[in-house]
């Protein structure tokens, strides 16, 4: 029975018994910061079990996509080495939310296994929690399981809880006896042994208690059921194999690895491990990227990168040099696409993400391996078998080797790693990043902010609804030190009880404007936010003296605030347009919003075409012309996400969030300032589109008056070009093309003439060929315009000299240039690179190259004759 058939039968079985089939949730959990990846079927029903969410069903079943790699559930290092560990797996589950309980759950499980799947009852064993007599009685009396096949285990194995407090309860597991051949051989081997003989296939969790902070268990009014059965494990049982990797779910992918590598699975255990690793990781990577994860250096993205790079390492061990993982997507799609159609829909996107990451790692993999091999040899010679932390860090920081990848590589050499030393290096780097202000005096400023905050000093932002406010001065800071007052000419930081100035955050620059007291006037150049509720004004005292405690009149510059608001709302519209034109994979990777421009970094894997840029620009300007209202509301985080608001994964949000909705176009969580309607943006113009990192593009744009100024500048430049080209009639491209065509024609004529001159010159030069040590040598100083002409001349001479060595010297642009060319027949005897390295110091320079052609440059052209003479001597001494 295939894995797909088992999945289908399971869901059908429970649907026929009143369960709603619920599609798998994404692997990336929505609005659950406690969870890196979905790792169990119950994840998407967590709020149902907690009583925080009511659904229109009380019975559910699902086949859930799961990943366990990183954090508490980390199977990565065992993947490929054991029969059952995976990073990606599917969990079949049935759930009851206050509906049925132990009696029905046990009956369902036993019926499905013994009647639908027809498993031999004599090979099935069960376990219950030590004190759960109720479950033991149901198994024995209701289902007829002999007492000798019912095992009791303690809290560690058979009691489940969601946390230190809250819903919890006993669980009951079902085991399948795979036979003595799969066991450890011990006469004491039984259920609970760590060997593979008695394999757990299904776990039934009975949530019947609420655990209080003091550990007291109170019965729940409506107990629930959460069960899980690994599809890979039950498939192994049904297909008569003892390894999940031998099931049809994974064998099809392994066969794809065989085709790519030319190796046969089952012939060599080391190759088999690598094939299993690649097959497993291909599934995990494909589903993770499909569900929205992207490779990065932190969080979920870093776990994904670790999985990909571990697969790349094992591909190299199989002799696969070119990007390989991207080709595995086809195999995963073939095996899983019917059950998960999103794989088919996003196939090309998944391949692009994987290829970009593989190419990035390929650039450093060989160099990193060479360094690691050298280090292993050095440590072995020193009598040590531990790779030091600083080496691990250098491999991570310079070559992109995750620490577990390094551990995996050196394990076969009998080495371990100094993980604690690595963490110390990482912490030093984090400390350096935290103190990047050090040396400028800014570290003192950082300390003073902490001191102010610890004293309870805060600054409330009141600038959403107005650009002015009256507030007392709470603190004045000069050169990182808190002072009582400041006088004209001094640059200071100022904290007030409330302020209309937006403190820089979320990519938006801080406001500028002015602050006045009865005795002073200050110009504010910006505002920052060292803490979410502490805003600091950066100001210069222009007149008078300002003191702590003074009443201040704070006024934000309206033109700059309005320009910033236009650019910020336009950024939201830009992201919406990019997603429409390029695809839903577009996600914000960074942004900058200031009065004069906006900058938006986003995930995309190829440069945008001119047509795509135009479509995005047209869409945004269409949104602007529609003059859609920009509505800002406060709501709880869960409601905002459910309503479809876009949020940044790594951003920290509170329980209540600010939602900015631009008509029906865009809805984002955002704390910035915005226009009241999209029409206020006026005009939107993309200035540049560039790449800033692998898979990250950047758009810079302007709006309103800034965009108009840019367009006018382009018009002025176009008019100036038209005047220079005498194309005032509007035919500038045609005129320019004619000019370029004429230039190309003249270049061809020049090259033709140069060829004739070279031929003539070579004839003259060849008369100077001499024989040195039985080898023809032509050493001459020539006059040429550039290095290309020097190379062209050497090519002509090589064709005419027969067999020989050519050494040319030329003064070009006040610099000495040497070129050595050796005909192919002599390149084994005389190497151009070696010869030029000996001559280059004579002209004050250095050089190198290949055996047949090498060049050098220097600062002393007056020594060219000496260098050419030395060529004769070097050749004679060979």
From Swiss-Prot:
Cellular compartment(s): Cytoplasm
Catalytic activity of the protein: tRNA(Ala) + L-alanine + ATP = L-alanyl-tRNA(Ala) + AMP + diphosphate
Predominant subcellular localization, coarse grouping: cytoplasm
GO terms for biological process, alphabetical: alanyl-tRNA aminoacylation; negative regulation of DNA-templated transcription
Enzyme class: ligase
A single GO cellular-component term on record: cytosol
Residues involved in Zn(2+) binding: 568, 572, 670, 674
Alphabetical list of Pfam families matching this protein: DHHA1, tRNA-synt_2c, tRNA_SAD
Cofactor: Zn(2+)
EC number, as in UniProt: 6.1.1.7
Keywords for this protein: Aminoacyl-tRNA synthetase, ATP-binding, Cytoplasm, Ligase, Metal-binding, Nucleotide-binding, Protein biosynthesis, RNA-binding, tRNA-binding, Zinc
Cofactor remark from the record: Binds 1 zinc ion per subunit.
Domain remark in the UniProt entry: Consists of three domains; the N-terminal catalytic domain, the editing domain and the C-terminal C-Ala domain. The editing domain removes incorrectly charged amino acids, while the C-Ala domain, along with tRNA(Ala), serves as a bridge to cooperatively bring together the editing and aminoacylation centers thus stimulating deacylation of misacylated tRNAs.
Role played: Catalyzes the attachment of alanine to tRNA(Ala) in a two-step reaction: alanine is first activated by ATP to form Ala-AMP and then transferred to the acceptor end of tRNA(Ala). Also edits incorrectly charged Ser-tRNA(Ala) and Gly-tRNA(Ala) via its editing domain.
NCBIfam families: alaS
Protein name: Alanine--tRNA ligase
Organism: Pelobacter propionicus (strain DSM 2379 / NBRC 103807 / OttBd1)
Name of the coding gene: alaS
